[in-house]
Amino acid sequence: MAERGFLVLAFDPSYTGESGGEPRYVASPDINTEDFCAAVDYLATRDEVDENRIGILGICGFGGFALNAAAIDTRIKATVASTMYDMSRVTAKGYFDKMDTDARYELRRQLNAQRTEDYKNGTYALAGGVADPLPEDAPQFVKDYHTYYKTPRGYHKRSLNSNGGWNKTSSLPFINMPILAYSNEIRSAVLLIHGEKAHSRYFSEDAFKTLQGPNKELLIIPGATHVDLYDNPEAIPFDKLEQFYKEYLK
């Protein structure tokens, strides 16, 4: 998007990568939403930025956080969520909403036991990134993640999914704190993008049903998988992104 004339700020989430903060490798429905709002704080004070023409873009889990940020931050005028996950939903209910009450209770029990162990040890246990080697019965979307995160295609030494993953206990708040509770009150423009063959497509489709008003759009990319929208230039609709931002950041 920078090559198309936009002033772009890319950031590592709080407590990860080149961003500061302790403890490291924490995920949070609140903090990771605030990451976008903090980016808007910074941009709005830059001389070269028109504070009334700020948009955001989130990918995968941060697509959901971007949508949540749009619900809370009225300074955001246009939001793109690409191949999004609702991390609170998938954590609390499992993939395709298959987790029942007993399974959710067991998850809470395990995570709270881990909290005690972490406190005793003085360190946070990591959940692990993408499995390597893959089990033979791994679902196709997990194989796709492996192809991205565990190969030169997407591997980075600071990528949590490529390495040790997030803190295990980071999952706890996502179980109890749904991030998209007020997405129906978003008044700014929203573009949801998802691959036709993505296992996660239902997140965008359901989010779109909740959004109100005429300035909301769901774009399904024919034949694309979830990770195609990470880095595949043949699948990522750059022309549409440019058109969307130019229309709503006038």
Language-model features: locations:
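Alpha/beta-hydrolase fold nucleophile elbow
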Residues: 47-61
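Short glycine-enriched nucleophile-adjacent loop
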Residues: 43, 63-74, 207
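Conserved alpha/beta-hydrolase
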Residues: 1-20
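Alpha/beta-hydrolase-fold enzymes
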Residues: 67-150
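Alpha/beta-hydrolase active-site loop
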Residues: 26-47
